[in-house]
């Protein structure tokens, strides 16, 4: 287990235990995803909360001010606990570990699909079905990214499996076969 996981796992498991006891798992998963998006969209926030110069009480006030009307009380209390324990600086790692453990417990595979352009809902549905068949899982969480250098098509990865159906890859293969 990597060092960061040895720190993040107990916190992630504790949060999962609380939400399971309160039967709030799906609600919390959605809130955690929204919180991660919010933090990722405001890198200065994470930098501020990670600052060793700020006192714990100041960090708690910032957390309350920003998040009290955006997240449920269980998640807010969890963030305050992380501030108290000097772990708020690794909040994104803890929340990502929470999502990872939830997926493991629920047998949900995580697939990342990178395409040249934004995928339509129909395209996402077709890709999801194909990946479910290939990965041999019943449930799939799809994360989409855009990379114009693919020219067209997509690259999907689930665990250690990669499906490269991009135009850039096909052009590269054609170039290699012509050079022989």
From Swiss-Prot:
InterPro entries: ATP_synth_OSCP/delta_N_sf, ATPase_OSCP/dsu. The gene is atpH. SUPFAM superfamilies: N-terminal domain of the delta subunit of the F1F0-ATP synthase. This is ATP synthase subunit delta. GO terms for cellular component: plasma membrane-derived thylakoid membrane; proton-transporting ATP synthase complex. Belongs to the ATPase delta chain family. It is found in: Cellular thylakoid membrane. Keywords: ATP synthesis, CF(1), Hydrogen ion transport, Ion transport, Membrane, Thylakoid, Transport. It is a peripheral membrane protein. Transmembrane segments: none annotated. F-type ATPases have 2 components, F(1) - the catalytic core - and F(0) - the membrane proton channel. F(1) has five subunits: alpha(3), beta(3), gamma(1), delta(1), epsilon(1). CF(0) has four main subunits: a(1), b(1), b'(1) and c(10-14). The alpha and beta chains form an alternating ring which encloses part of the gamma chain. F(1) is attached to F(0) by a central stalk formed by the gamma and epsilon chains, while a peripheral stalk is formed by the delta, b and b' chains. F(1)F(0) ATP synthase produces ATP from ADP in the presence of a proton or sodium gradient. F-type ATPases consist of two structural domains, F(1) containing the extramembraneous catalytic core and F(0) containing the membrane proton channel, linked together by a central stalk and a peripheral stalk. During catalysis, ATP synthesis in the catalytic domain of F(1) is coupled via a rotary mechanism of the central stalk subunits to proton translocation. This protein is part of the stalk that links CF(0) to CF(1). It either transmits conformational changes from CF(0) to CF(1) or is implicated in proton conduction. Pfam families: OSCP. It comes from Prochlorococcus marinus (strain MIT 9515). Coiled coil: none annotated. One of its GO terms (molecular function) is proton-transporting ATP synthase activity, rotational mechanism.
């Amino acid at each position: 287990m990597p060092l960061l996981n040895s720190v993040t796992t107990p916190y992630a498991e504790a949060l999962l235990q609380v939400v399971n006891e309160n039967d709030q798992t799906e609600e919390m998963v959605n809130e955690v995803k929204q919180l991660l998006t919010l933090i990722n969209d405001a890198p200065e926030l994470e930098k501020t909360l990670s600052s060793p110069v700020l006192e714990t009480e100041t960090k708690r006030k910032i957390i309350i001010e920003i998040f009290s009307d955006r997240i449920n009380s269980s998640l807010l209390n969890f963030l305050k606990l992380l501030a108290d324990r000097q772990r708020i600086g690794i909040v994104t790692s803890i929340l990502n570990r929470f999502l990872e453990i939830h997926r493991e417990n629920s047998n949900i595979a995580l697939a990342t699909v990178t395409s040249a352009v934004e995928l339509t809902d129909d395209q996402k549905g077709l890709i999801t079905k194909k990946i479910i068949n290939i990965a041999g899982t019943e449930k799939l969480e799809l994360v989409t990214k855009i990379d114009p250098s693919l020219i067209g098509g997509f690259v999907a990865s689930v665990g250690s499996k990669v499906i490269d159906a991009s135009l850039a890859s096909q052009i590269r293969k054609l170039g290699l076969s012509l050079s022989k």
